Amino acid sequence: MDRTQSPKTALFAVLATLLVLTVNGQSLCNTHRFTNNLAFADCSDLSALGSFLHWTYNEQNGTVSIAYRHPGTSASSWVAWGLNPSSTQMVGTQALVAFTNTTTNQFQAYTSSVSSYGTRLERSSLSFGVSGLSATLVSGEVTIFATLELSPNLITANQLWQVGPVVNGVPASHQTSGDNMRSSGRIDFRTGQASAGGGGSGDRLRKRNTHGVLNAVSWGVLMPMGAMMARYMKVFADPTWFYLHIAFQVSGYVIGVAGWATGIKLGNDSPGTSYSTHRNLGIALFTFATLQVFALLVRPKPDHKYRTYWNVYHHTVGYTTIILSIVNIFKGFDILDPEDKWRWAYIGILIFLGACVLILEPLTWFIVLRRKSRGGNTVAAPTSSKYSNGVNGTTTTGPHHQDA
């Protein structure tokens, strides 16, 4: 090797290294040139999804001209960027949305105020003025342009950006993992500072999922199964049915209270967001279930003159709780908007429980009537009077009068 080439080679390597470090140290948004010769005072490489935000803040009139860029987009995807004045979650976000209109085959932009987790990004006005809204899709890169008329409390705000599929001409749910759950942060249009959101939205999603699972299992599965134990097992085994009934109901109540508490926590963490029907049904369920628990403490003896009234109360509140719980679980599905498989999985559980009822109801009546025709008790002989619900601890007229 020619030794005279070594210094030149070393110098070239050093220069190449410095060039790479310089390019890597320079914000990618600073190197972008817009085809329409627009120029912006500040820009930020956003922390997720490979997106960029360019803006110019006009302090005199309180407006911000922005350009949001998202590369690697297909014609069957939607892209959105927005501000949330109260939190880093999706609900409450004032968004700019862009995707290809399948009817006109034109790439369009519009505004959408996100009011629920099941949103389809419907067109709606925002809490602040927007002018000059437009969007382009060039070589797989979406750019949304707009001028925002911001109040002082929005000069520093939470920003969120997202991408998802378009299905049948309508924006569908985005992915709930990876960068899609990290695409939020803070933006200060005046100072030009932007920071990552720290994954808060992912934590909220986990809390919502936990809330949904706890309530679906407790109110939607364990409670109905506990009622079925009391209604259908009593003719076969006493006091086994009683212990199973109590075990299912108490387990359902404990898990349900945990789910209810997570719902309260989610509500407190989401100011300005309210699902009044879902919340009110949840409060009613908690109240009814708590009344059922305390009712057990004042349950009259089987031969007490008020036992019949207690049974009517216990049945009415119990079945009302089960019906309301199923209704509220589907309300929760509408709010959380999970993949369809979860909704269908719960529907499958309800169908299974319903099939069990259709089989056990006539079977129970058959056993009750046969025992009655033979002059015997309609329930299995109890080992203790505390498990019996008939008048004076003897027979009942059928399964409708049985309870814990």
Curated annotation (Swiss-Prot):
Residues 170-369 form the Cytochrome b561 domain. Keywords: Electron transport, Heme, Iron, Membrane, Metal-binding, Signal, Transmembrane, Transmembrane helix, Transport. Binds 2 heme b groups non-covalently. Residues 1-25 form the signal peptide. Residues 49-164 form the DOMON domain. Gene3D superfamilies: 1.20.120.1770. It is a multi-pass membrane protein. PROSITE patterns: CYTOCHROME_B561, DOMON. GO terms for molecular function: metal ion binding. Pfam families: Cytochrom_B561, DUF568. Residues 173-183, 380-404 have a biased composition (Polar residues). InterPro entries: AIR12_DOMON, Cyt_b561/ferric_Rdtase_TM, DOMON_domain, UCP037471. It is found in: Membrane. GO terms for cellular component: membrane. May act as a catecholamine-responsive trans-membrane electron transporter. This is Cytochrome b561 and DOMON domain-containing protein At5g35735. It comes from Arabidopsis thaliana (Mouse-ear cress).
